[in-house]
UniProtKB/Swiss-Prot annotation:
PANTHER family: L-RHAMNOSE ISOMERASE. The gene is rhaA. Mn(2+) binds at H262, D294, D296. It comes from Salmonella dublin (strain CT_02021853). This is L-rhamnose isomerase. Homotetramer.
Length: 419
């Protein structure tokens, strides 16, 4: 440990103690908050089922940065490189298309055995796993409908895929000793004016009820459902709207997924957390950065990321909110994208833990909004970065931007040789 880092740490402890904050306790709390990294940043949401196929479902990965992972071995190696550069607890979020098999496997036939390599890898890296059925990039989703499809046979295919995915998710939780959160997102919707808004939603309701009919131990598996405002090709009507899934999660007591990019640009999910928590048992967050639409840019340490973290900490939602990331930027180094986004999420959580929330609540309750604003702003200038650097040091991860040297070396030695 450098003398400079030690000195900064000691000064930071004193500064935060002056406002009633125990920085050691803040770091202990930070170690209770895993962030689930998404595997699909590493290969542009291609997966291993049909890596050369088109990405569909109204989503896009844009850019042409070299070094994309081409198989599971490369993807796991890239993830390991990123994991080494991120302090504290992590998880990994997988999609169904990241299965491994020597022969083609239909999506409604996926089994735990197709993910055993991921489980063994997760054990070796002390990670929990989360899961998602993949209801896009498939011939049977080409017309824009899956679980709400008017054709009963196609609809059943997607129901069976989601049911099979839940068994995989439960397998993850059983094997790893930590529940897998399985999130259902579907692209279903229409490009232009839609006459019958009700029938597709009725079909989706019934399909979801069938999907979740098999019971699993909540210590192994947690169901979540995710809404979206619109997607490319589904600008006018989305079957799985916010109101639909809020009602579904409330009535069925599943987790509700809030994605930062899935709402109108003037809406923020940080303000939705406290409202939703009054009705649903759990929330899954997909922290992302929408630029004018659901563009899935890399997460920044910006106002909304901070607000999301502050909501979790201020309301002590550690055991009810699951933090996941969802972005895929192909214009920059993919390993760096993971590191930047995940470290930023963790920085936001730390800053929230270093806030004198009790004092701020008292000021708010007494109507002293002047002091509330003053303290909130002064808090931003306190030396939280010295606490972050100590956290990195204790977890044997690089301090500051030193991690970029490791990424550059990995790019030169490994990524640049991929064609």
């Amino acid at each position: 440990m450098t003398t400079q880092l030690e000195q900064a740490w000691e000064l930071a402890k004193q500064r935060f103690a002056a406002v009633g904050i125990d920085v050691e306790e803040a770091l202990r709390q930070l170690d209770r908050l895993p962030v689930s990294m998404h595997c699909w940043q590493g290969d542009d949401v291609a997966g291993f089922e049909n890596p050369e196929g088109s990405l569909t479902g109204g989503i896009q990965s844009t850019g042409n940065y070299p070094g994309k992972a081409r198989n599971a071995t490369e993807l796991r190696a890239d993830l390991e490189q990123a994991l080494r550069l991120i302090p504290g607890p992590k998880r990994l979020n997988l999609h169904a298309i990241y299965l491994e098999s020597d022969t083609p496997v239909a999506r409604d036939q996926i089994k735990p055995e197709h993910f055993k390599n991921w489980v063994e890898w997760a054990k070796a890296n002390r990670l929990g796993l989360d899961f998602n059925p993949t209801c896009f990039s498939h011939p049977l989703s080409a017309d824009g409908f899956t679980l709400s499809h008017p054709d009963a046979k196609i609809r059943q295919f997607w129901i069976d895929h989601c049911k099979a995915s839940r068994r995989v998710s439960a397998y993850f939780g059983e094997q790893l000793g930590t529940p897998s959160v399985m999130n259902i997102w579907i692209p279903d919707g229409m490009k232009d004016i839609t006459v019958d808004h009700l029938a597709p939603r009725q079909r989706l309701l019934e399909a979801l009820d069938e999907v979740i009919s098999e019971k699993f131990d909540p210590a192994h598996h947690i169901d979540a459902v995710e809404s979206k405002l619109f997607g490319i090709g589904a600008e006018s009507y989305t079957v799985g709207s916010n109101e639909f899934y809020m009602g579904y999660a409330t009535s069925r007591q599943t987790a509700l997924c809030l994605d930062a990019g899935h709402f109108h640009p003037t809406e923020v999910i940080s303000d939705k957390i406290s409202a939703a928590m009054l009705y649903v048992p759990r929330l899954l967050l997909h922290v992302s950065r929408p630029v004018r639409w659901d563009s899935d840019h890399v997460v920044l340490l910006d106002d909304e990321t901070q607000a999301i973290a502050s909501e979790i900490v201020r309301h002590n939602l550690f055991d009810r909110v699951h933090i996941g990331l969802d972005f895929f930027d192909v214009s920059i180094n993919r390993v760096a994208a993971w590191v930047i986004g995940t470290r930023n999420m963790k920085k936001a959580l730390l800053r929230a833990l270093l806030e004198p929330t009790d004092q701020l609540r008292q000021l708010e309750a007494s109507g002293d909004y002047t002091a509330r604003l003053a303290l909130l702003e002064e808090q931003k200038s306190l030396p939280w970065q010295a606490v972050w650097e100590m956290y990195c040091q204790r977890h044997d991860t690089p301090v500051g931007s030193q991690w970029l040297d490791s990424v550059r070396a990995y790019e030169k030695e490994i990524l640049s040789k991929r064609r």
